[in-house]
Amino acid sequence: MKTIVICSGGLDSVSLAHRIAAEHELLGLLSFDYGQRHRKELDFAAACAKRLGVPHQIIDIREIGRHLTGSALTDDVDVPDGHYAEETMKTTVVPNRNAIMLAIAFGVAATRKADAVAAAVHGGDHFIYPDCRPGFIDAFQVMQNHALEGYADVILYTPYVNVSKADIVADGAKHHTPFAETWSCYKGGTRHCGRCGTCVERREAFHLAGVTDPTEYEDPEFWVAATAAYVAEEVK
């Protein structure tokens, strides 16, 4: 299956790229610059493409991102600390981000005669991000079937959509993903902050997967209290 992977440079998408390279025909990586404050992740996507020996294309959609205001990922809004399941994490939503990126990716895939576009959406994203849920994925596929009818047959490949981030870590380890060469933190500092939702989720995932986490965090122990509070809330 000739596949283009949407790769942010994060743990999930880099692990997916390594999986595709091992199991299918990886045509290349596609990244998007939408004005995210953690733009350094794109450097990790470029490194992944070089490592796997495939082309890397960055699509500049900063002008679109400029109009998607109010998100902690693009605006001068504080990135909240804590677990992803907390209501405060909704400030990290960039409206329609995945829909926009996927539509562009499908156009690129059709032009390059790819069989699939792969995206690393996963079960842990469902609570906060509506465009990571199975219903969205299924509906987007139907829409693209109509949009490309008679021109190209491209599928949306999302092998992680119903699994946890811990499962992705395990899968990444299986396919020799160099986890130290991935970037998750939304704050875009020198090191992972260890406190934002994606850092907490990353740290927890390694713990649950039983895989050594090579990541350097500014606050390496914050995740313990953040995840404990979430579990306690679930029990109530």
Swiss-Prot record:
Its cofactor is Zn(2+). ATP binds at C7, S8, G9, G10, L11, D12, S13, V14, S15, L16, A17. Pfam families: QueC (PF06508). It comes from the Bacteria. GO terms for molecular function: ATP binding; ligase activity, forming carbon-nitrogen bonds; zinc ion binding. Its EC number is 6.3.4.20. Keywords: ATP-binding, Ligase, Metal-binding, Nucleotide-binding, Plasmid, Queuosine biosynthesis, Zinc. Pathway: Purine metabolism; 7-cyano-7-deazaguanine biosynthesis. Binds 1 zinc ion per subunit. The keyword Zinc applies. The keyword ATP-binding applies. It catalyses: 7-carboxy-7-deazaguanine + NH4(+) + ATP = 7-cyano-7-deazaguanine + ADP + phosphate + H2O + H(+). InterPro entries: QueC, Rossmann-like_a/b/a_fold. Gene3D superfamilies: HUPs. Zn(2+) binds at C185, C193, C196, C199. GO terms for biological process: queuosine biosynthetic process. Belongs to the QueC family. PANTHER family: 7-CYANO-7-DEAZAGUANINE SYNTHASE. Catalyzes the ATP-dependent conversion of 7-carboxy-7-deazaguanine (CDG) to 7-cyano-7-deazaguanine (preQ(0)). NCBIfam families: 7-cyano-7-deazaguanine synthase QueC. This is 7-cyano-7-deazaguanine synthase. It comes from Sinorhizobium fredii (strain NBRC 101917 / NGR234). The gene is queC.
